[in-house]
């Protein structure tokens, strides 16, 4: 499982930071979080395959998070996409997409499914055998969502228990693995009788644009998240600006990471005012003096991060 930071800037792009977009590669599939302008070109410089993007998660409808959608949707159509593509976002996402695609002429023949998510309560929006995706309402100047991707691990077969019960490799063991019970020597044996608890799966949260929310930290802790991607638009001397614009500072993001219990926090959505990051680095050094175990990274465009 791997993250690729396609764009790590904020409202205005710079020479070094494109508009926000992050891909997550899992089990041969690409999950895209936000799709700012220039996303499809950033993808060219990575190993991300646009044709393997089946789900796009939009945090909110500000232009810097959505204006890459029409180009990306058109390009995969040119490449022959026929498979449906799912787009998740807050209220008005369907109207936004309709308006964008009504500008100019587009040849998009594959199905696009739009799912509008409540920005009032947390929801599990996708559930499969291998992963789950949750939304969480955050506080910004427009309806906004955070997202959490969590890997689902299956129970592990306990060979010691299998041998002790006298179950041989064959049809009975296969039925147990498939979730069915079997009868052996007059005793009913279930999958729970021969398995160990599942290992902890990888869990990563993405804040989108938001003020710092302790409730989001508690949600991440509840889901046992290990990695957090959190916006850090400003350094801590710009706290007033952050409050006025409903964004977060470096210190805000680090504090939410601490409260959530994650091992790693990756800071993104960096304001265009920062040509260099010494102010960010100073804030991190100060925070880590009292919290040395937290792994902190500042995202850069095209940076990759393996999730283990």
Curated annotation (Swiss-Prot):
* Matches recorded under Pfam families: Lactamase_B (PF00753)
Q: Which residues form a coiled coil?
A: none
Q: Name the residues annotated as catalytic in the UniProt entry.
A: 64
Alphabetically ordered keywords of this record: Endonuclease, Hydrolase, Metal-binding, Nuclease, tRNA processing, Zinc
Q: Which reaction is this enzyme known to catalyze?
A: Endonucleolytic cleavage of RNA, removing extra 3' nucleotides from tRNA precursor, generating 3' termini of tRNAs. A 3'-hydroxy group is left at the tRNA terminus and a 5'-phosphoryl group is left at the trailer molecule
Cofactor binding, note field: Binds 2 Zn(2+) ions.
Look up the record and name the cofactor or cofactors this protein needs.
Answer: Zn(2+)
Q: Which GO terms describe its molecular function?
A: 3'-tRNA processing endoribonuclease activity; zinc ion binding
Query: Where does this protein hold Zn(2+) 1?
Result: 60, 62, 140, 209
Q: What is its EC number?
A: 3.1.26.11
Annotated Zn(2+) 2 binding lies at 64-65, 209, 269
* Origin superkingdom: Archaea
Tell me, what does this protein do in biology?
Answer: Zinc phosphodiesterase, which displays some tRNA 3'-processing endonuclease activity. Probably involved in tRNA maturation, by removing a 3'-trailer from precursor tRNA.
Q: What family does this belong to?
A: Belongs to the RNase Z family.
Q: How does it assemble?
A: Homodimer.
NCBIfam families listed in its UniProt record: PRK00055.1-3, RNase_Z
What name does this protein carry?
A: Ribonuclease Z
Starting at the broadest rank, the lineage of the source organism is: Archaea, Methanobacteriati, Methanobacteriota, Methanomada group, Methanococci
């Amino acid at each position: 499982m791997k993250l690729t930071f396609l764009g790590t800037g904020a409202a205005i792009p710079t020479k070094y930071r494109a508009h926000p977009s992050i891909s997550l590669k899992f089990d041969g599939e690409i999950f895209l979080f936000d799709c700012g302008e220039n996303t499809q070109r950033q993808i060219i410089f990575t190993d991300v395959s646009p044709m393997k993007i089946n789900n796009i998660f939009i945090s909110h409808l500000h232009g810097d998070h959505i204006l890459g959608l029409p180009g990306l949707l058109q390009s995969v159509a040119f490449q022959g996409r026929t498979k449906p593509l799912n787009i998740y976002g807050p209220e008005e996402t369907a109207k936004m997409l309709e308006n964008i695609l009504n500008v100019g002429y587009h040849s998009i023949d594959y199905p696009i499914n739009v799912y509008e998510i409540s920005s009032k309560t947390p929801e599990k929006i996708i559930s499969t055998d291998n992963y789950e995706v949750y939304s969480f309402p955050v506080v910004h100047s427009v309806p906004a969502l955070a997202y959490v991707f969590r890997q689902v691990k299956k129970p592990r077969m306990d060979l010691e228990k299998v041998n002790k019960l006298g179950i041989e490799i064959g049809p009975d063991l296969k039925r147990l693995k498939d979730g069915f019970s079997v009868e052996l020597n007059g005793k009913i044996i279930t999958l729970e009788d021969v398995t160990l608890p599942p290992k902890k799966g990888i869990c990563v949260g993405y804040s989108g644009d938001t003020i710092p929310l302790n409730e989001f930290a508690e949600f991440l802790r509840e889901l046992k998240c290990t990695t957090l991607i959190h916006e850090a638009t400003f350094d801590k001397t710009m706290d007033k600006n952050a409050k006025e614009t409903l964004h977060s500072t470096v210190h805000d993001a680090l504090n939410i990471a601490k409260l959530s219990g994650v091992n790693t926090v990756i800071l993104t959505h960096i304001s265009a005012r920062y040509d260099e990051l010494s102010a960010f680095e100073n804030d991190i050094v100060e925070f880590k003096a009292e919290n040395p175990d937290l792994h902190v990274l500042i995202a850069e465009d095209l940076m990759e991060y393996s999730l283990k």
